[in-house]
Curated annotation (Swiss-Prot):
Catalyzes the formation of phosphatidylethanolamine (PtdEtn) from phosphatidylserine (PtdSer). Belongs to the phosphatidylserine decarboxylase family. PSD-A subfamily. This is Phosphatidylserine decarboxylase proenzyme. Signal peptide: none annotated. Pathway: Phospholipid metabolism; phosphatidylethanolamine biosynthesis; phosphatidylethanolamine from CDP-diacylglycerol: step 2/2. Its EC number is 4.1.1.65. One of its GO terms (biological process) is phosphatidylethanolamine biosynthetic process.
């Protein structure tokens, strides 16, 4: 429990969090347990293997380095301009489509594919108040397949965003073929800022962002672009 901000029925505010200092580490906090255990095991095996013949230690050292790389949490420069929509995930932007959403209405959906080499922390696209967090059980299809959006296990986080008149923005965390663990600590009533971390998907997967479509919306991102959570600008709502 100590490795998590929220886990099971335990939760505390930042002011009461005895482990808040872990937010300053260069690694994602919710991955510290795996990071410590897997790195230590890999390094111990490297020492043992190296005792017999040093080249045998190389694969274990590489595994330790890969684990540390996977759970890294680089600092991001978050745009402050009102109306700016930033990427909720690192990876490759594989989809920009217009959709009719049952809650948002006329909308634009952005799909981001995360490989095992990307940072897997999820960040808020626009500041707002969380109005719904919904979990759906499902399959574990390859995240590159279009049907994974609806059929795979996922979590929706919906925010009411004052910068666009209180309309809803949705971020969906989707599991993949190998990524079968979603972490989300956003709670209904939380007020989250643009670029603020709210969760993580462990191993390769997919993240989607759905925003309202209107005449004031200018999309600046392009399909195929490599994006960074919290800093890459997807779109802007012109203020006027």
């Amino acid at each position: 429990m100590k490795y998590y901000r929220n886990q099971d029925s335990y939760w505390w505010a930042d002011a009461d969090d005895p482990f808040l200092w872990r937010e300053s580490l260069p690694f994602v906090r919710v991955g510290l347990a795996e990071l410590i255990i897997m790195t230590l095991v890999s390094l111990v095996l490297a020492v043992i293997a190296g005792w017999f013949w040093w080249p045998l230690a190389v694969p274990f050292v590489l595994v330790a380095a890969l684990v540390a790389w996977f759970f890294r949490n680089p600092r991001r420069k978050v745009p402050e301009t009102i109306g700016t929509v930033v990427s909720p995930a690192d990876g490759k932007l594989v989809e920009i489509v217009e959709v009719d959403d049952p809650i948002i209405g006329a909308a634009v959906r952005f799909g981001i594919f995360l490989s095992v080499f990307n940072v897997h922390a999820n960040r808020i696209a626009m500041p707002g108040r969380v109005v719904r967090v919904r979990y759906r059980p499902g399959k574990f299809l390859n995240a590159l397949r279009s049907e994974s959006t609806k059929e795979n296990e996922n979590i929706d986080v919906e925010l009411e965003c004052p910068e666009i008149g209180g309309r809803i923005v949705r971020i969906r965390q989707i599991t993949g073929q190998f990524a079968r663990r979603i972490v989300c600590w956003a709670r209904v009533g939380d007020v989250l800022q643009r670029g603020e971390m709210f969760g993580m998907i462990k191993l390769g997967s997919r993240t989607e962002l759905v925003i309202p479509r209107d005449e004031a919306l200018e999309i600046v991102a392009q399909v195929g672009e490599k994006v960074c959570a919290g800093s890459t600008v997807f779109a802007r709502y012109q203020q006027g």
